[in-house]
Amino acid sequence: MTQLLNRSLIMLLKSNIIVQDVQSYVVQFGFEAILKEAISFDKVDVVKSLNKLRAVSTTELFLASSNNALKVAEWLVETKKANVNMCSEIFKDTPLNSAARHGSYKVAEYLIAKGAAVNGYEGALLGPPLYEAVSGKYLNVAKLLLEKGAAVDQRKSGETPLHAVAKNVRYTSKDIKDDEIYKLLVSYGADTNAKVEFRRVGFSIYDGKTVSEIAEFKVALAGESE
């Protein structure tokens, strides 16, 4: 039943019918369900209509960033005055982190233009925006961040973005030097000899290893902890 309702909601959003009588559909589907799907499809008119019924939180900028919902992001920043550098309580990251994590190029570009800090906050649990873009293999977002001044060797849990490339390459037969993101990072001066710093808490199979050592470490260990 839930899946059927979700499919019906998505069809209504795609056809723009829902914006004609959003209050009735809120009764049927629920405010939060409509808001979530409206943002994911970048239906800013629906989001605006929902805002008339109940104030839409500026923290929805995280969801808009994850979904590359540029129109919604613009409305949240320019009309709702959302802070592009707001920090999430759980992950200690910003909307730009969310955009980088999901490869949302258009929103990442917009957020930076509006003053988003390209290096995010120190101590973000999932790493700085560049690390997240590299880890997700989003070359265009990584290039954008570097062009806008992102620190090429900024670490996440002791690892630089080059270490993230090495981890991605590790499970393939590719030579790391042929990887486009590797070449991009090196062109911006990334340290190819950097070692993974030992963590204060926990253990990683990568601790103390260089980029090349990680890339060549092809055999996965049972129960390994990254």
Swiss-Prot record:
Keyword Repeat: yes
Keywords assigned: ANK repeat, Repeat
Record's protein name: Putative ankyrin repeat protein RF_0939
Coiled coil segments of this chain: none
Repeat (ANK) residue spans along the chain: 56-86, 91-120, 125-154, 157-194
Keyword Membrane in record: no
Top-level lineage group: Bacteria
Matches recorded under PANTHER family: ANKYRIN REPEAT AND SOCS BOX PROTEIN 1 (PTHR24173:SF27), ANKYRIN REPEAT CONTAINING (PTHR24173)
GO biological process: ubiquitin-dependent protein catabolic process
Organism: Rickettsia felis (strain ATCC VR-1525 / URRWXCal2)
